[in-house]
């Protein structure tokens, strides 16, 4: 912290001055010595021999200047790095002090009790919860400062590597042995990358690499995770094939040859994956300059695009190469995408889009390239395309652009795509084939479409896929492109004939998560009372109301696709729960003093949507083909999903964090779920819980409970009087009439009359 970093800039000035002096000496030598052998007064063998020696000396003067300038540049680079890191460390120390911490000269963090008031100090001594919160805070600050100190150490090691390398004469043909370095470079990261490449290449070749060298490779990845020069220099040296072979070797070591150091090898994969992510960044957005557009081609043709173009061309070549055996193949793309899954960095949208296109082209050219033959390769997921889609889900904007049915770019730069159609309807999804002595047994991959489901959820919502325990909020803002994706999903999943919309089991929950975030729109569509949705359903599939984008699909298509999603009870529960929350919020938005008509319209619409849900629920239960669930199990799973976390949800967890809501806003749905939860039996008693679910999912009971909770909070309805009770009964009746309308309409869409 007290080191005088100005010494680095002073030294840099000195080396720059030395380069200038060497330049003067070069000119003098060239004029007064080297020139003698070039004239006509000295001829013959001795002149030729002298000329060769003079040439070497002249080159050494030139190389010495190059080396001196490079050292000066490295010193300035080191100064910039150390000054930045020291500034961050000082800022962290000051932040810790501001948070009532002490930081010693050795970087040890402790709680500064001397700054506390006497009452606070007393509370700290006697309150275990207070003490635990302090311990957590101390650990947090200690971790932050330790990491910053480690960053300084990492940077210092990188500087050491650069200064050791810059003075090495790498040209064996310049006439000297260990002379000045005419190839010296003034960038620390380039030397770190070259050193890392040398270690990585030996590792990829299966050669001996020491523990110290592995630690150095890990440090280089860690220290340069955000440096494009390092990333591109390293990957240019390794090339796609070297990167693939290195991945395979790291997997072999982690899962087979050296299992006790598995964590280290996986961490190295993470560093390599982060390097790929940084090196393949493309300026701008795929929505503006999509693959194949003139704007993208112009960038590729420039200096900045040269690395990317060469890398992608070579990846295309080696991605389709088999690095395994004929009976147990392992294709380059499979290894490369599995490597990408280790990254903690968001991949560029253009890179993901192009790689997705390349993977589709590869499997169209060579069928079954992504199938699994025999035992799974450790650390490798055979279906590289589905694996890439899972990675894409972590960049929702990239996923939206990849699936947008309208394509990307504008004017002459517009490029369409059919990814949604291909992946939902046309692709023959890879299977798992296991050879036996008498036959080959082929089964479906149990993880098939997991990546697709995550990517579609991200694409249609603009958010990361929801995790277990997270609820979709029923009214989220969406872009036009996201609404087009959601509309496109429904269009691709709707049945071409009959009433069945078969949805793969691994797509049901993620698509329900996505659709539930359009509940404000599905509520209107199922309610059947807004002409805007009817008009837009057969047009663009969305419409705008001011700054708000709305999804529009036909009522029939929506009901049939929701029926397909509802084969999974959790998916059905997700949709029903979101709808219940939206109805509750809509009821709360009815102004006090509203007329009966102003109240009955939204309540009738609410009833119609619940009627559609009733028809869908009955359709699933009465389907003899219902796979994997008995009727009782299906209903019980719905129950546990809906009541779980629904009671007084003061903060609804979402993909982006959480949305805080008031207790009163969801009081109706909370009361309903709370009563339901109190009625539930032990989880193993599925038949009993199924009967309870029937009672609470019955629209009469659900809406009566929600309306009662809503009415009790209103000043314009006195539910203790006969008049108030009559008004509540009339409103409940409006809902139930709407329920019959919605149920009858949905049943019509779910009844196959072709037989």
What does each model-found stretch correspond to?
Residues 1-172, 208, 745-755:
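N-terminal secretion-targeting helices of virulence/extracellular proteins
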Residues 40-43, 47, 68-71, 127, ...:
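Alpha-helical rod/repeat scaffolding segments in eukaryotic adaptors/tethers
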Residues 172-651, 665-749:
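Non-catalytic all-alpha helical scaffold/repeat segments
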Residues 650-659:
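Transmembrane helix interruption/hinge and helix-loop junction motifs
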